[in-house]
């Protein structure tokens, strides 16, 4: 069975086996995932340090890197280059720049005494990833078509909500409770983190099927890219949750 992922970087048709002898492997996908995460980390550390020295850069970096990363992600998903590593590497760096600036702003401006919040969010993200990997490995949750359909619908709804919130932000307001630190706001963050965690199961399933059905070697990059997209989203949601709990 080929599962339909809610992650556009892991679309099923990308993982069809080709006529060449170079095939997608799990080790190759893991290595490429680690490479992209390393670039995200480098970008994050650079922007965090830059914003710490000049806080006025925070919003500029967030907007510039956020928009740049969005454009590159769309380019990768629409163009589908045979050698996507350059665009994906550029995306990872920009995403890292965004995360670094965002993390600094949350730690130093959203909270008073927010020291340690970034480490807590990182630990939480790693814990969720390892938990879902274990759950997937032992077949506790399987990415069946019905499961993927539900997750896809939830992810789509969340993205629409964020888009609507962004539009409202342009007019000086936001969706009620979305960013609040009360019980409803915390509950929303927990729901979003749960959906992101379930999306990891979908991504694991798609990558496994790519390896199983002999997808082309360059699909390792797409598998890694999709996984990094999910992990970045998970970290951002985890950081928001920890901030709300500490507020």
Give residue spans per PLM region.
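A hydrophobic alpha-helical transmembrane-helix feature that marks the membrane cores
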Residues: 1-247
